Amino acid sequence: MANNLESNISQIVLKKFLPGFMSDIVLCKTVDRQLLSGEINSNTGDSVSFKRPHQFKSERTETGDITGKDKNGLFSAKATGKVGKYITVAVEWTQIEEALKLNQLDQILSPIHERMVTDLETELAHFMMNNGALSLGSPNTAIKKWADVAQTASFIKDIGIKTGENYAIMDPWSAQRLADAQSGLHAADQLVRTAWENAQISGNFGGIRALMSNGLASRKQGDFDGAITVKTAPNVDYLSVKDSYQFTVALTGATPSKTGFLKAGDQLKFTSTHWLNQQSKQTLYNGSTAMSFTATVLEETNSTASGDVTVKLSGVPIYDEKNSQYNAVDAKVKAGDAVSIIGTAKQQMKPNLFYNKFFCGLGTIPLPKLHSLDSAVATYEGFSIRVHKYADGDANKQMMRFDLLPAYVCFNPHMGGQFFGNP
């Protein structure tokens, strides 16, 4: 039956738009999209909170008598999701109308959903880069051997992450450099493949799914220098950080009066404090070397005239003697501890990402229909998208707009991070 161009146009266009949009996404498929579903809407404001899981400690005794022992407390903790900015593509109605008449709607819609997916996945990549606390490899060293990929699976397993899929996301050039190991490449014989299928380098390599993406975020390192140490020991007991998994620390020894001394995405290494396996609470080792705790800068910060820097970090060296089941590290960060900044000052880079599916979450706000007879909203596999036909009276034009409003949450910064190759 021919398309009726007089009514329900937005609904017709939306039905065509959604499958193409889903076919284009890659990065969005690797993070949790269910926990945000139904929790955040147009009435929740700019944030929404999610409950973090409880952890418990065990008592080891000779007789089983736990008289006088501290019992596990139930502490309610939350992760807070933030609503982003609208992603909107507006086009003149005449383009859509002509495509409908000629049965060429797919060709017109393709660049629209490609643009929306690109914006969405680049913003998601920035969010993930700035929130993941883990760090592997040598900055700006290319991924060129499968051992560079396998290190991510080793770290995720060793730190005690057991549930959900694990991913290593690399730029497209990494696939070329890994192409000599043909047995590791993902293969499929279908003629038409989605962006997800085309992105796969390896379906499962040592417990990690290797994917390529052109949506990874690039950044420039801060203008840092100096022998950095902790000036004041931060408060990192569980009750102080449970709702954010972020902390602020005062450092000293920086080059004085530097604007942009640290930038968002920079990673700090606390060399005297080491990661624990989150289940067994044993110190992590790579060979004979204990793995130092790392955290990621959330906001750009300057150094003072006296060489001090106060920085907000994602990832927390939790050390709580009373609630040790939540400990992330083997020792408390102390004043005087050495801190190194990973990488080179003012270095341009595009980090690869590795993480567990439950590191971050993505959702979209169900948007209300605009005041019009021709406005459609649909939720499809966790994505809510609005299509609206309207008139621009001032410009004397008929228009159609496509809208999506994303929301992002970091459930646990200790479940993801940046990685590079090794020299």
From Swiss-Prot:
Compartments reported by the entry: Virion
Keywords, ordered alphabetically: Capsid protein, Late protein, Virion
Pfam families associated with the record: P22_CoatProtein (PF11651)
Database matches in InterPro entries: Phage_coat_Gp5 (IPR024659)
Highest taxon listed in the record's lineage: Viruses
GO cellular component terms listed in the entry, alphabetical order: viral capsid
Region (Disordered): 47-67
Chief place where the protein resides: virion
Listed Basic and acidic residues bias regions: 56-67
Purpose: Assembles to form an icosahedral capsid.
Family: Belongs to the P22 phage major capsid protein family.
Full protein name: Major capsid protein
Species assigned in the record: Acyrthosiphon pisum secondary endosymbiont phage 1 (Bacteriophage APSE-1)
